[in-house]
Amino acid sequence: AGVVIGGAIPDCIALAERLDSPVCSGYQHNDSFPGSHPMAAGPLGYNGSKAGMELIAKADVVLALGTRLNPFSPLPGYGIDYWPKDAKIIQVDINADRIGLTKKVSVGICGDAKQVAQQLLAQLSSTAGDTDREARKATVHQTKSAWAQELSSLDHEDDDPGTVWNAEARERESHLMSPRQAWRAIQ
């Protein structure tokens, strides 16, 4: 929430573009980074982006900018225990009591997300992010594309084995559109 509340979205975009680094948003904070941006990997946590989870699992450094790392964002999803075990975690939060509260961090920074992002940008070397830049961009694109294809394949309205709630809802309210029908309609 710190990125949104602090007006740091443009600074977050600038960091992502400077480093060509994928950006995941926290649980229920999809507004913290534009989903249309090429480096947007999507939200983490319950019903989040499988692409984001796969990408963050490969991270060697995670900058948790303006987030308390709530307990829901790093929960496993889609059978992926994605929170990186060996990555250096840098957590930036305006509330010092939240730093390291739910996840072990390598570096904790108590500060405003916007100011910290601007200071980080100013301190980056001219070659920061150059190593494997093109490969990283390709990996982000391929991972997001695979997730988009998987989502578009979810074109059935069948219930999971042993459940009937979809069938009952369709019968009861046939005039309403299911989420999967809505997804297909906007494709």
Descriptions of predicted regions:
Residues I9-D20, G77-Y82, V107-G108, S125:
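Short, solvent-exposed amphipathic alpha-helical segments in soluble enzyme
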Residues G7-I9, P34-G35, F72-L75, L101, ...:
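Short glycine-/acidic-enriched loop or helix-start segments at secondary-structure transitions
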Residues D86-Q187:
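Phosphate/pyrophosphate-binding active-site segments
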Residues V4-G6, D31, N70-P71, D97-I99, ...:
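Short, acidic Gly/Pro/Ser/Thr-rich loop/turn segments
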Residues A1, G26-Q28, T67, V92-I94, ...:
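Cofactor-binding loop segments of dinucleotide-utilizing enzymes, especially the Rossmann-like FAD-
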Residues G45-R98:
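Phosphate/diphosphate-binding loops
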Residues A1-A59, A182-Q187:
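Anionic-ligand anchoring segments at beta-strand to alpha-helix junctions in alpha/beta enzyme folds, i.e.
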